Amino acid sequence: METIRPEELADLQLKRLKWTLRQAQEVGLYQKKFKEAGISPDDIRTLDDVEKLPFTYKKELQAGYPFGLFAVPLKEIIRIHTTSGTTGKPTVVGYTRQDLENWSELIARNMTMIGLGEDDI
């Protein structure tokens, strides 16, 4: 990944962004926000189009407490992380098995990138 050509990286980023936006459309909050903004994932044709996307605010995330912002059925969530931050009102993030596998791979790649190996941990 670290040696990918810039054009290939941009294509990959756009593909993954569109996938993420399609997933987000499964969440009522984002259905509403996309509709109000008059935008859909298909309207994102370049990375610069990210400027068309509406902002999400922490109060909106907190309003979804506890499970209102999951884009997958609750039975697919295998780990939950909550934080209260400074407001005392929780924000909840749910992770699927695939999310955790992706996270593990990302961390391993980052460790390799900075020169760490199996014997260093």
Label every PLM stretch briefly:
Residues 121:
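Active-site-proximal cofactor/substrate-binding loop regions of enzyme domains
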Residues 1-82, 88-105, 109-118:
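Nucleotide 5′-phosphate-binding alpha/beta core
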